[in-house]
Amino acid sequence: MMMMMMKKMQHQRQQQEDHANEANYARGTRPPISGEGPTSQPNSSKQTVLSWQAAIDAARQAKAAQTMSTSAPPPVGSLSQRKRQQYAKSKKQGNSSNSRPARALFCLSLNNPIRRACISIVEWKPFDIFILLAIFANCVALAIYIPFPEDDSNSTNHNLEKVEYAFLIIFTVETFLKIIAYGLLLHPNAYVRNGWNLLDFVIVIVGLFSVILEQLTKETEGGNHSSGKSGGFDVKALRAFRVLRPLRLVSGVPSLQVVLNSIIKAMVPLLHIALLVLFVIIIYAIIGLELFIGKMHKTCFFADSDIVAEEDPAPCAFSGNGRQCAVNGTECRSGWVGPNGGITNFDNFAFAMLTVFQCITMEGWTDVLYWMNDAMGFELPWVYFVSLVIFGSFFVLNLVLGVLSGEFSKEREKAKARGDFQKLRENEQLEEDLKGYLDWITQAEDIDPENEEEGGEEGKRNTSMPTSETESVNTENVSGEGETQGSCGSLCQAISKSKLSRRWRRWNRFNRRRCRAAVKSVTFYWLVIVLVFLNTLTISSEHYNQPDWLTQIQDIANKVLLALFTCEMLVKMYSLGLQAYFVSLFNRFDCFVVCGGITETILVELELMSPLGVSVFRCVRLLRIFKVTRHWTSLSNLVASLLNSMKSIASLLLLLFLFIIIFSLLGMQLFGGKFNFDETQTKRSTFDNFPQALLTVFQILTGEDWNAVMYDGIMAYGGPSSSGMIVCIYFIILFICGNYILLNVFLAIAVDNLADAESLNTAQKEEAEEKERKKIARKESLENKKNNKPEVNQIANSDNKVTIDDYQEETEDKDPYPPCDVPVGEEEEEEEEEPEVPAGPRPRRISELNMKEKIVPIPEGSAFFILSKTNPIRVGCHKLINHHIFTNLILVFIMLSSAALAAEDPIRSHSFRNTILGYFDYAFTAIFTVEILLKMTTFGAFLHKGAFCRNYFNLLDMLVVGVSLVSFGIQSSAISVVKILRVLRVLRPLRAINRAKGLKHVVQCVFVAIRTIGNIMIVTTLLQFMFACIGVQLFKGKFYRCTDEAKSNPEECRGLFILYKDGDVDSPVVRERIWQNSDFNFDNVLSAMMALFTVSTFEGWPALLYKAIDSNGENAGPVYNHRVEISIFFIIYIIIVAFFMMNIFVGFVIVTFQEQGEKEYKNCELDKNQRQCVEYALKARPLRRYIPKNPYQYKFWYVVNSSPFEYMMFVLIMLNTLCLAMQHYEQSKMFNDAMDILNMVFTGVFTVEMVLKVIAFKPKGYFSDAWNTFDSLIVIGSIIDVALSEADPTESESLPLPTATPGNSEESNRISITFFRLFRVMRLVKLLSRGEGIRTLLWTFIKSFQALPYVALLIAMLFFIYAVIGMQMFGKVAMRDNNQINRNNNFQTFPQAVLLLFRCATGEAWQEIMLACLPGKLCDPDSDYNPGEEYTCGSNFAIVYFISFYMLCAFLIINLFVAVIMDNFDYLTRDWSILGPHHLDEFKRIWSEYDPEAKGRIKHLDVVTLLRRIQPPLGFGKLCPHRVACKRLVAMNMPLNSDGTVMFNATLFALVRTALKIKTEGNLEQANEELRAVIKKIWKKTSMKLLDQVVPPAGGQCGLCFLSPSRSRS
């Protein structure tokens, strides 16, 4: 009994400790080990309790045990038993033999009976389970609670309050037991020292505290009610703490901890980024304050009254280009609250920050932009908002993703390594045990020899059986026949010996073999695929209002197919045997689907169940489509990697679920029953009960319209003017944690696993190639044996060679990214030793690109059968084409013709402008035609190699020019054809691709990416399709509704009805009743797929979800909250497709781009980091430090360079920022004056700073630093600003102007003044030069911008092409205020079209714009339509246009950004002990102190002190002793000049080389030669002088010269 108790205690203790270790490990602290008893190692002070340490200890113990066991061999069993116990013990106890403190709470020793009881209870397994169940039950209780408006309640809630006490008691008891068992605080493994325990502790204490408070307030309430209310609110706030209890579940699930740990670890780099984001927000908020303060409060009022003139008011402007009040008798004046109930504005710093944050999240930013356009005119606002979205969203927020994916893969590798080690240990253990058993068995065999013979016979009989090519035979033989023989009695044996049964067995065996061969054949596979395809067809042909015959056919087909699938299953079972059949996951799944189908059919036939319920089962059959993957390796690898990531995703989903639950419960506490402030409309996204709260939180998590929910929350607490603004914190935290952190972990997991899948693919390819090679070799050797004639042999070999070469030549054309050492065989036209622009998103700086192309020779063969290679005409053409002026001219013409396309007027096609542009068009077309003819004359048309038409890019040119020519030919005959051809002219800019090399590489890279993405496209489309089919089953015909909500079927929905505007009985409006379908519906598979696509882009999905929830019957109106459970369909779809598949899509693009970038350096022996560091070391130049000789100047210089001066300026900038942020709308005159004076003071101070610096550094030295130039610009701008505001006193009072409308001059003059006021804000940017981490971030930012020019060009081209097509197709749609195509958002001019596309790229309600461009829309009154054709504008092409644009943008283009960023910012998560380019700046800075003149050399004696000042990994650090530093320096082999100096680049290069171990092993001279070759290969332009400096050639001087001086010094 005692033994069992001990064991149990050990087990529980191990568990507790594991948790403690895990948590401590997560926080990065290592619990020290208390006195470890006799087993502890002498160096226990240094030991770290990581789980592998425990394992190593165990290994040592096992070794010791082994040595014992060898000395005493006989009792093997007992020994292995003891060993196993020992191992288990050591494993359980971690490292410390007694983790519990000797005393708990200063009084209870380990032998104290109370404490022993506590320990045994706490470490008892059922106790753990009980607590987990209690937590779970508590969550359920919290969820059942229904919040009511005005703090009402019902009996359930009262009962729940009582249950709450029970939970509180349970948790309190648990806490006290644990505290007694482990001690409270002072010991290493004490209770509160574990993070999870601390959380428990706080929750319990707060719970107790709230109960006590409640009792106290109840007692005081007896006296008077008013005092109790406030106490009640406090309790409510404390009650909200209970919602954290679900977090305790985390400590029970280890895989959750990996995800959580990686998120927690990522917090440090994330903080850097958070600072950067905050910085961007602050700068933009202050600029917004300066530009837009008080602009949102003017709107159109009726003259002489305070009644707003419009239904949905918008800001307006007195004059200028803003919105004018159109209705007569209305005027523009201030006095309106502002949009969104006055929440969205720039009236003071807090509101401005909230508005800017909302714009960065890309929800509702266009609304703010449009309001600003209305208030100020459209010249200025777009610059502000578009730059904010590009910087804030695309760049800075994508950094979050980079950091998370880096951390996640690191954390996963750690966990994996830990797991592998554990497995290794266990295997060793097993082997030892096995050895023990083998000893036993050999002994036993010696005793019992008779059995052996029988076994032999049995074996013989088995081997005679022929085995098939598959392993399953053997398993099945054993399982099938072995069992029957074993189970039969003597009777069975008698029967089995008879002839008949033997025949039957033989026949059975033969049949099964035949069946198996059939099942495994490719024909059978294709048959099944055809059946699956037919099955898919029947299911997808279902739609709303289908004719009866179709329904019958579908029923019959379903039954027939079901029968066939059942047959297939049975045949497989028979041929493979049950055991082998169920090994494959696919077969299990198949079986499940078939059984489901059979049950469904039976239930429907017996009319036990409506067909709808189970028809979803039918759709699950569609999963069979994935059978295709069996013979398609890359696809099956992809599916495999998806299934692999399911594990990590499951734990992430659990975490996500916990997160959603906690925030839903919190939301119910805060907003339950509060969203009833507007009686006229029912809000759908509320927190009134648990399911609804879950949906709302999930909606905020996807980021769709989260700002609308936030506005409701603020209004519920009294609107923007009250303290209600505080609640926005809840929404912001929820949005940041959920959308940015948790959802990006999805992406991180995706990227991580995809990289694995890719490596799997390549490995398989290599294996296949290897097999192929062996096959060929075998064939050859056979042939050689056949005919032993040596001549034949030689011929065969040489023949082989030729074919291989030919093959290579052919393939060279196809492979756009050859490795480093193979010349590009892209096309005869550009032959080059190496692509100068690396493929992938990191092209080198344009300055480095060698844009000179080698001139391509005239190809062999005659052009047009008449012009030979030497024909003078042809030679002349060749010269002309290759002349640089000609190529540049053509580029210019391409640009001009593109500009002409953009300048066309889409509405009035016969306007003067269009006529002029038409003439230009003729000219451009003529020029391009001549160019093509010249090229064809030179290269020939297409019959021979290298001809003009053999290059895809040339074909593109031909197409574009041909289209233009054709459209001139048929000017009037068929209008629509011409229209299409005119649209095709848009492809002109694409011709530039062929002219700019860098662009060409990016484009090729995109194509490669698209090729590789193919597989994922297939999987995603299949999933889309499946969900669409299920959606059709669930919702077909159910999304109809009447415009009058009182009527619920088409028969009643006729005539007119009266609507009261805003619930006001005095303002009735008459409307017509119309029975209409939803724009997005599930009536057939295609519309279902479109609806689901919009859901997967997260745009407008809540509206669709609530339509689905309200859906009632086919062709019947909605019923409020009719089936809430339907929302599960949408949530599963969003999680599988939108979160997971779309992220994998994105991840795939990123992985592909990174691989393409690396491909170029495939054979260059240096990895990316080494390349970057070496490049830096080769290109860096020493910094000049100016130290003045003049003593007075030196004093100035000394002051300016001192730290106190720096800090003073820092503080001043902060104060200046504070002053700027204090401005607000309607500020008093006094405040205004104070602000102006402060502004002058600051301007004065910064001017003084500039003057001091100019004196100290002299103008030349001052302006050589970029930051100083920036400073001086700001100072000059500020001075102009002060001067202007003094000269024009009206400006300084930023009170709104009187309602009189001053002239336009006033307006423009004001804009110029506000422009100069921006200089005040720009001082903030100076802060960036101060922080170290931020500086590195900025440096990387600039670096990634250099990688972006071609990507940006590609994006610009995409936008250009789509904008021009949009103008041609949708330019005539009329602008209406209540429509998506309106004054702010339309295709009527080129800039407007580009802005609209930019809006779609950020995903702002793109699907609504698409609907507004469909056919049947009203035409613009100015456009040329015939009478009766008012409603003919728009086109069905809109669907293709918008969906293709959205996909290109969201998945390809924006991911180019992400790929570039993740590439450049990997240093944020990399191990800081590995040298990276960001460490090398420090070397330059410190070198300049020893070499102020930037001569590039210092005395060798200074090198040691220099390196001891630089921190590792680059230098030695201050802690490195002098002698060690000297020794390490000698080992570096740094070249030393004859005058005893060392060179800058040589020193830096040697440091990089030793830190990254680049070619440091082996023979030194040989390594140097190899390294020289690599450098020459990658950096062709490195001068030989520099190369000899950094890597001395063989026989040159070497770093051993360091020996003598260092000896003399030491």
Swiss-Prot record:
An example of a Gene Ontology cellular component annotation for this protein is: voltage-gated calcium channel complex
Localization in the cell: Membrane
Biased composition, Polar residues: where in the chain?
A: 37-51, 462-487, 790-801
The protein's predominant localisation is: membrane
Locate the region Phenylalkylamine binding: 1430-1473
Q: Which residues form the signal peptide?
A: none
Placement of IV repeats on the sequence = 1190-1465
The UniProt regions of compositional bias labelled Basic and acidic residues, in chain numbering, are 765-789
- The glycosylation sites are 154, 224, 328
Q: In which tissues is it expressed?
A: Expressed in brain, heart and skeletal muscle.
Query: In what ranges is there compositional bias, type Acidic residues?
Result: 824-836
The way this protein sits in the membrane is described as: Multi-pass membrane protein
Q: Which GO terms describe its molecular function?
A: high voltage-gated calcium channel activity; metal ion binding
Give me the Extracellular side stretches, as residue ranges: 145-162, 214-234, 293-380, 543-557, 604-613, 673-726, 904-919, 971-976, 1036-1125, 1223-1237, 1287-1311, 1371-1437
Q: Which UniProt keywords apply?
A: Calcium, Calcium channel, Calcium transport, Disulfide bond, Glycoprotein, Ion channel, Ion transport, Membrane, Metal-binding, Phosphoprotein, Repeat, Transmembrane, Transmembrane helix, Transport, Voltage-gated channel
Which intervals of the chain are annotated as region Disordered? 1-99, 448-487, 765-846
Region Binding to the beta subunit: list its residue ranges: 428-445
The family classification in the record reads: Belongs to the calcium channel alpha-1 subunit (TC 1.A.1.11) family. CACNA1D subfamily.
Instruction: Show the domain comment.
Output: Each of the four internal repeats contains five hydrophobic transmembrane segments (S1, S2, S3, S5, S6) and one positively charged transmembrane segment (S4). S4 segments probably represent the voltage-sensor and are characterized by a series of positively charged amino acids at every third position.
Subunit details for this protein? Answer: Voltage-dependent calcium channels are multisubunit complexes, consisting of alpha-1, alpha-2, beta and delta subunits in a 1:1:1:1 ratio. The channel activity is directed by the pore-forming and voltage-sensitive alpha-1 subunit. In many cases, this subunit is sufficient to generate voltage-sensitive calcium channel activity. The auxiliary subunits beta and alpha-2/delta linked by a disulfide bridge regulate the channel activity. Interacts with RIMBP2. Interacts with CABP1 and CABP4, resulting in a near elimination of calcium-dependent inactivation of the channel.
The protein's name in its UniProt record: Voltage-dependent L-type calcium channel subunit alpha-1D
